[in-house]
Amino acid sequence: MPELPEVETVRRGLEPVMVGARILSVDQRRPDLRFPFPDRFPERLAGRRILALGRRAKYLLADLDDGDVLIMHLGMSGSFRVEQAGPAKTLSPRGAPPKNAAHDHVVFTLTSGGRIVYNDPRRFGFMQIAARADLAAHPLFRSLGVEPLGNELSGAALARLFAGKTTSLKAALLDQSLVAGLGNIYVCEALHRAGLSPLRQAGSLTKKSGRPTERANRLADTIREVLEEAVAAGGSSLRDHRQTNGALGYFQHNFRVYDRALHPCPTPGCKGEISRITQGGRSSFFCSMCQK
């Protein structure tokens, strides 16, 4: 499933094409994806100008000029591609699919002549429309925690969120009501860089005074560092993720621990090897020698 860096990569690819453009038409090719499309979905979007394209956790949010927001989620295998107006281009096998490819479920045609195509083989993505004024109270967003990409996440924030929690540090980081948008890959990578075990109690990052420990400060910085590097690399393409130009992300080539069980630990001076355990039904990859 695309995690925050993959969704942010898609947002940055769509933003220069969509923001300021007007939607000429919407070609909705099936009645549902993970959930049914909103009633009169094409009619409600046709003629609307896109004022901004944001992201909250793993959701893309297109602000429209009538006060509504188009909410988009990529699910397991969803992707967007941009087709600019002009002659069709011949693409390599590793490039974007041709026009009207299999599993193209929604096509947004802009007044510029360009097209934004949503492709989703497994159909776990979805799209909804909500009023911007009601978004904070919307069921999808009202329980989301802090954003980890940006200044909202800090050692003090982690100390406040994790105070008194006996759950594992990894489970706490994956709890979307605490930190929104983190997934298994980037939690494993951030914990390794921070030298913290996924099995450590989350509450151990908070002092009795409620202030953050040095570990909390280090972890907050490391999470942001890993996410920023992943976005710069276009995300991680393990199965379905592609950027809006059809290119694959390449952060998977920078993994230190994820999916690297039995490999030597890459931490300088560490003689351990990467272990794989299961936590909450998910694989955790870490080095027991240098992650404490």
Swiss-Prot record:
Annotated signal sequence is none
Q: Cofactor note from UniProt?
A: Binds 1 zinc ion per subunit.
Q: What is the lineage of its organism?
A: Bacteria, Pseudomonadati, Pseudomonadota, Alphaproteobacteria, Hyphomicrobiales
Whether Kinase counts among this entry's keywords is no
| UniProt keyword list | DNA damage, DNA repair, DNA-binding, Glycosidase, Hydrolase, Lyase, Metal-binding, Multifunctional enzyme, Zinc, Zinc-finger
**Organism encoding this protein:** Methylocella silvestris (strain DSM 15510 / CIP 108128 / LMG 27833 / NCIMB 13906 / BL2)
**What is the superkingdom listed in this entry's lineage?**
Bacteria
**A GO molecular-function annotation:** zinc ion binding
User: Which cofactors does the annotated protein need, by name?
Assistant: Zn(2+)
* Stored PROSITE patterns: FPG_CAT (PS51068), ZF_FPG_1 (PS01242), ZF_FPG_2 (PS51066)
Query: Where in the chain are the FPG-type zinc fingers?
Result: 256-292
Is DNA damage there in the keyword field? yes
Q: What does this protein do?
A: Involved in base excision repair of DNA damaged by oxidation or by mutagenic agents. Acts as a DNA glycosylase that recognizes and removes damaged bases. Has a preference for oxidized purines, such as 7,8-dihydro-8-oxoguanine (8-oxoG). Has AP (apurinic/apyrimidinic) lyase activity and introduces nicks in the DNA strand. Cleaves the DNA backbone by beta-delta elimination to generate a single-strand break at the site of the removed base with both 3'- and 5'-phosphates.
Enzyme Commission (EC) number: 3.2.2.23, 4.2.99.18
| Reaction catalysed by this enzyme | Hydrolysis of DNA containing ring-opened 7-methylguanine residues, releasing 2,6-diamino-4-hydroxy-5-(N-methyl)formamidopyrimidine; 2'-deoxyribonucleotide-(2'-deoxyribose 5'-phosphate)-2'-deoxyribonucleotide-DNA = a 3'-end 2'-deoxyribonucleotide-(2,3-dehydro-2,3-deoxyribose 5'-phosphate)-DNA + a 5'-end 5'-phospho-2'-deoxyribonucleoside-DNA + H(+)
Concerning its family, UniProt says: Belongs to the FPG family.
Name used for this protein in its record: Formamidopyrimidine-DNA glycosylase
Tell me the SMART domains matching this sequence. Fapy_DNA_glyco, H2TH
Active-site residues, Swiss-Prot/TrEMBL: P2 (schiff-base intermediate with dna), E3 (proton donor), K58 (proton donor), R282 (proton donor)
Q: Which residues bind DNA?
A: H103, R122, K165
Give the record's GO biological process terms: base-excision repair
Q: How does it assemble?
A: Monomer.
